Amino acid sequence: MTGYGANRLTVNMDAIIQNFRTVERFVAGKTGIMAVVKANAYGHGIVDVAVALEKNGARMLAVSNVDEAVQLRDAGICVPITVLGGSTEAGIRETVSLNAAQAVYDENALHILQREAVRLNKTALAHLKIDTGMTRIGVKGDDALARLLSVWKDCPNVEMSGMFTHFAAADTDATFTETQNERFKRACACVHAAGHRPFAHAAASAAIAFGDNLWYDMVRPGIALYGGTDCIKGLTPAQRLTSYPVRIAWAEDGDTIGYGRTYTAERPMRIMTVPIGYGDGYKRILGNRAQALVCGKRCNVVGRVCMDQLTLDVTHVPNASMGDEVVLLGRQGIECITPEEMAVWADTISYEVMLGFDSRRVKKVLM
């Protein structure tokens, strides 16, 4: 198989389920699991992943926005869904119809939920978001929380089914993480004193590994489900990005390669051209930094990554030929390029790497 249209992103659903099982074993029944499928399941396909997780025992799912919740309900997903992000008025109203829980952190959202619940003669579900240090969304400070809890007394159709926070640096700053945790504990005490009994959740993937003092009633694995982190032993990357060469030719000593002439051959080099580029999600910054796998060997990306093509040095792979699979992310033989490794090359994080190949020009294949 050669030529354009050769690019494939293979999503290993078995790996995602095994990662879910790995998290289950890690928490050992001490807490529940809310599987995070936001951002198209981190680029893996929100509906396919959600269906597989529900089938394999996931009891609750988390998304970022209401559109994602609609996708899941339209696909027949029945388990509880929590919208972790803020929503527009129309979106907040829709969560009531969807029987999804909406993150709430201000009076406006609370009033919208109350009005819509009354209109539909239903109970709206809300998860109270506490800002303990992200300074993004959430109720911040004791006074603001007290005011919101006071308003909640006048919203009998809104059930506080959950409350949550998010840690800013669970993988890098233990002291600040503990500070955030103490703030969340204080907020939980205030909520309980006001008569609410929500389940609490705070730990995403890195915080799960931090320790069980952060687990509360439920944890929220996201990146861990897709193998984009090694914070828990035994996780496996679920994506494999492949292509096939469209040209293999020799460059002479002194030839320059690609836009800007950023790479100069210092010897005769065998160059493989691969039809994938930043138009497909393979980042431009990876030029002269990244590697790919050809015939089980690591080959350097030489020259700039173009919109539609990149070039590899395959001089040390004399048997490389047209028709050989090129692995840009994932395993080939004993070698493996992980999302974390690619993230280092790209000066980013594995999350962005995995989300980057959600392109119409890269065919997604489930296995």
Give short role names for the model-derived ranges.
Residues 22-25, 254:
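Conserved helix-loop functional segments at active or binding sites
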